[in-house]
A protein has these predicted regions:
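Thiamine diphosphate
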Residues: 1-129
Length: 129
């Protein structure tokens, strides 16, 4: 039996994005100035032309991802759960959900396990949203 390798969820997410990027040229990754924290920097290093840093602007990133999706791209939005679910909820609902667009949302640092970032970065609501 093989040994199970324990890694942080964000590390597994980054590895999966790179694998998807190798197989599918339409995959693009967007982040909200959190490439180091969400580990999307790994994708950026492999495919810099398919990585977009949207700055600290999750709602705007949602609109960008929606637009890319309408052009045949498969965007993966990446941010902390508090900001991907909480801050951008209306844009996710209206710009991605209602038109049924093919946008993926990768949210790291969920729940109350964000450590030193504190209460403003903790998200318990993400499951409900």
């Amino acid at each position: 039996m093989s040994e199970v390798k324990k890694v942080a969820t964000r590390v597994g997410y980054a590895e999966a994005l790179v694998e998807l990027g190798k197989e599918h040229e339409e995959v693009v990754v967007l982040d909200a100035d959190l490439a180091a924290a969400t580990q999307t920097k790994v994708f950026r290093e492999q495919f810099p032309e398919r990585h977009i840093d949207c700055g600290i602007a999750e709602a705007n990133m949602t609109g960008i991802a929606a637009g890319l999706s309408t052009c045949g791209k498969v965007p993966f939005m990446s941010s902390f759960a508090m900001f991907a679910a909480g801050r951008a909820f209306e844009q996710v609902r209206n710009s991605i959900g209602y038109p049924h667009l093919n946008v993926k949302i990768g949210a790291t640092h969920a729940g109350i396990s964000v450590g030193e970032d504190g209460a403003t970065h903790q998200c318990n609501e993400d499951i409900a949203l």
